Amino acid sequence: MNSAGYEVFEVLSGQSFRCAEGQSVLRAMEAQGKRCIPVGCRGGGCGLCRVRVLSGAYRSGRMSRGHVPAKAAAEALALACQVFPQTDLTIEYFRHVGGNKPDNMNYEEVTS
């Protein structure tokens, strides 16, 4: 257990913030006034806060398989509202392209 929390770095925005033990990446970002990931339902259902974890260990909460299919989760895609760091993390915000079909695995990096 790390009482000081973990550093989370979002590569596209260049922003970083601290995430307390047991706190989701999205809640930590909001609490510190950062805006590198869009905020939606905060409960794993809308898919708006989709990220790819580039490095670090984390625990995932419940996420809609309509937004993060098992194959995508295996490729380190997750919803920031359901990502709970266990080490420092490097993440990248991603947007889904082509609708919300679980079998549609087209993702694109958002650079704007």
UniProtKB/Swiss-Prot annotation:
Residue ranges the record marks as coiled coil: none
Pathway: Aromatic compound metabolism; catechol degradation
Any one GO MF annotation of this record: metal ion binding
GO biological process: catechol-containing compound catabolic process
Binding site residues for [2Fe-2S] cluster: 41, 46, 49, 81
PROSITE patterns recorded: 2FE2S_FER_1 (PS00197), 2FE2S_FER_2 (PS51085)
Keywords: 2Fe-2S, Aromatic hydrocarbons catabolism, Electron transport, Iron, Iron-sulfur, Metal-binding, Plasmid, Transport
A matching Pfam family: Fer2
InterPro entries on file: 2Fe-2S_ferredoxin-like_sf, 2Fe-2S_ferredoxin-type, 2Fe2S_fd_BS, Beta-grasp_dom_sf
Matching SUPFAM superfamilies: 2Fe-2S ferredoxin-like (SSF54292)
Record-annotated 2Fe-2S ferredoxin-type domain positions: 6-97
Function recorded in the entry: Ferredoxins are iron-sulfur proteins that transfer electrons in a wide variety of metabolic reactions.
Family designation: Belongs to the 2Fe2S plant-type ferredoxin family.
Name of the protein described by the UniProt record: Ferredoxin, plant-type
Organism: Pseudomonas putida
